[in-house]
Amino acid sequence: MAKKGTRIVVTLECTESRTVPSSKKRSAGVSRYTTEKNRRNTTERLELKKFCPELNKMTIHREIK
C-alpha cells in the first residue's frame, strides 16, 4: 500500500479583507488562493504576500484550515 504524499493542498485567505469596511472595498467578499506545501519542510502555517483583488493591493495571505 502506498504512503500518503508529503505535499498537501492548502487555502490562503487575505488577512485585511475582513477588517476593512465594505465601502472601501472594490467588491464584496474575501480573497482566497489555493496552493501546495510540503508538510515535512514547512510544518507551521504558510504566509505569503499576494494580490488581493477586493482591496486592489498586495496583502498578507495566511493558511486557513
Curated annotation (Swiss-Prot):
GO cellular component terms given for this protein: cytoplasm; ribonucleoprotein complex; ribosome
Xref: InterPro entries: Ribosomal_bL33, Ribosomal_bL33_CS, Ribosomal_bL33_sf, Ribosomal_zn-bd
Signal peptide start-end: none
Annotated Gene3D superfamilies: Ribosomal protein L33
Entry keyword Nucleotidyltransferase: no
SUPFAM superfamilies (alphabetical): Zn-binding ribosomal proteins (SSF57829)
Disordered, as annotated region: 19-40
One GO BP annotation of this record: translation
Pfam families: Ribosomal_L33
UniProt record similarity statement: Belongs to the bacterial ribosomal protein bL33 family.
Name of the protein in its database record: Large ribosomal subunit protein bL33
Organism: Prochlorococcus marinus (strain NATL2A)
Recorded name of the encoding gene: rpmG
